[in-house]
Structures are given as structure tokens and as C-alpha cells.
Amino acid sequence: MWRLRSTKEQRAQQASFVPTEYNNIALDSEGFFFVTTQTFNSNELTSGAAKPVRRLNAIGTNILIENGTSHVIGDLQWARGDTNITNSGPSKFVDVTVLDNDIYSVMDKTHNRIFTYDKQGNLLWAFGGVGNMDGYFLNPVALEHQGYDLLVLDSQDCCVTVLTPTEYGKLVYKATEQYHAGEYAASADTWREVMKRNGNYDLA
């Protein structure tokens, strides 16, 4: 109504409000919403201005913690500009699931990979890819969890893949949970066990 009564100059000064389109949503243990969106400028990803994953409070403010060495954007490098490469470009998340320990995983549709982060925004691991081998996907459309297991729905394969963590993965979960619970000595011991299995693991 006000726009009808406004002058051309006044309308030009009014900011247009375009709501963000979210393509999936998950509820965490504290009642906050984790959401994913593919509506962003890819040039703003590395600076952190674009937020493809968000944790929203009751008034819609993003309160996702990003204290890791990089932003929560999935792949940190990708082919830019005009390219004929299949599955090129930045990660585009289609779903998110939040475990009871506040660790969350997101499904990337560009490269068919899963990225898992702790509550501080540290990348714990990334895996997957395009293909029909074990651990790879053709067209992942949904991600869910049951305990520590991740369940991926692939619409092209017409199947649900259940991904169970290895002993190494369970140790990473355990060390992360202990650290966030304030059990620093116990967490350090568990991280040492992680280091025995992977001496290049940055968080350990």
C-alpha cells in the first residue's frame, strides 16, 4: 500500500526484501534450526559473507559458530568461471543432519560428498564422491542419522546407504565429545589414540 503512495524517488530508496530460500532443515538438541541454502554469491564463500549452512534462533538470526580454520562451506577450492567440467563449482548443500552430540553433517550435491563439523565449526572429515562404488553416490537428495550412523537417500540409485563410523571415526567422535564436555585430560588421551592412526589429523 505504501509503495502505491510513494514517489518514484522514494521507491528507489526503499530496500527490497527478498527472504532467503532454505532447501532443508534439521532440529538440534537445544531446539535450534539448522538450515541449508543454495542461494548465495559464490564469490562471497571464502570471505565468510555467504552462509550456506546456518543455525537459526527463534527470531531467525544465524548463530552458527565458525571458529574453525575455514568457514563452513564444504570444498575450499573449486573450478571457477566458465567450465565444461562435470560436477564443478562450489559445494551446494541439499541437506543437513545434527547428531545428539551437536556434531553436524551436510550433503553436498555438487561433488556428492558429506562434510562433518563439530559445534565450533571445525571440519572433522569429508568423504564420498560421484559414482556407484561403496561410499559414493549418483544423486544424493537427503541425509539423516541414527545414532552415529549416517543414512543417505540416493534418488538415482533408488536406495538408502547406511554409513557406520569406523573405530577411527568413533575415536574422533569420542575425543570431540569429551573436549566439549570439559573433560580435557580424557580428550587429550583420546586424541593421542587418533594420532596413532592418523598422524596428519590437524585437530589432534
Cite the ranges covered by each PLM segment.
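Eukaryotic scaffold repeat domains enriched in small/polar residues
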Residues: 1-203
